[in-house]
């Protein structure tokens, strides 16, 4: 019985969080996270980049992520926010994210959101 209650609590938690993280295709089409699950390149460390020049490996762009998920202070210091962002990134098969601070050309751009580019390293 306890497992059943815990299972439903997790479902409710993830369904509430999913609406705060929106995935878009490269073409700007809104995507469902359930449809995005793919395997990663085998690199197990999640990495957040603040500049494309920091990336040493070749990569391809998978998707874009937009979020209005609440965070304390600067988002990269908020452990809960970063944990959710990491889980979403790895779930979609990406190896890393690029924080897109100054890009306003994302689909349905909203200044209240943070935007990221999800990338996958080439093997």
Where in this protein do the model-derived segments appear?
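Post-signal peptide N-terminal segment of mature Sec-exported envelope proteins
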Residues: 26-46
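Extracytoplasmic
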Residues: 43, 60-62, 94, 111-113
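Sec-dependent N-terminal signal peptides
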Residues: 4-13
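Short, well-ordered alpha-helical segments
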Residues: 62-102
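A composition-biased, non-transmembrane "mature-region" signal
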Residues: 41-44, 48-51, 55-61, 79, ...
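Short acidic, glycine/proline-enriched helix-loop-strand junctions
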Residues: 76, 104-123
């Amino acid at each position: 019985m306890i497992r059943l209650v815990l299972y439903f609590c997790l479902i409710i938690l993830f369904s509430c969080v999913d609406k705060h993280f929106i995935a878009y295709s490269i073409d700007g089409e809104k995507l469902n996270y359930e449809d995005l699950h793919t395997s990663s390149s085998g690199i197990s460390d999640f990495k957040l980049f603040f500049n494309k020049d920091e990336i040493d490996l070749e990569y391809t762009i998978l998707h874009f992520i937009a979020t209005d998920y609440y965070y304390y202070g600067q988002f990269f210091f908020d452990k809960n926010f970063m944990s959710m962002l990491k889980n979403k990134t790895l779930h979609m098969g990406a190896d890393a994210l690029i924080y897109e601070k100054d890009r306003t050309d994302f689909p349905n751009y909203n200044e209240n959101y943070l935007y990221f580019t999800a990338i996958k390293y080439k093997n």
